[in-house]
């Protein structure tokens, strides 16, 4: 049920819509100036490609088969000791 006592200020709504469309809201320019868009795009691209700062360094040092064997041995030792 609509509240008929409050009227919409059409001029204010138009102003807000215009600010939103242009990306210049109340905080738009303050925070946007601190964001390096090119750097963010580069980081997003690296993340999507799986090549983050540490992506290849750690992946190349991990032998999944060896880890599985170590986990299996640890589980067997734990069962024998309990």
Swiss-Prot record:
Organism expressing this protein natively: Bacillus subtilis
InterPro entries: Spore_gamma (IPR006341)
Pfam family of the protein (one): SASP_gamma
Biased composition range(s): Polar residues: 1-24, 32-50
Sequence repeat segments: 19-45, 46-72
Family: Belongs to the gamma-type SASP family.
UniProt protein name: Small, acid-soluble spore protein gamma-type
Keyword Repeat part of the UniProt annotation: yes
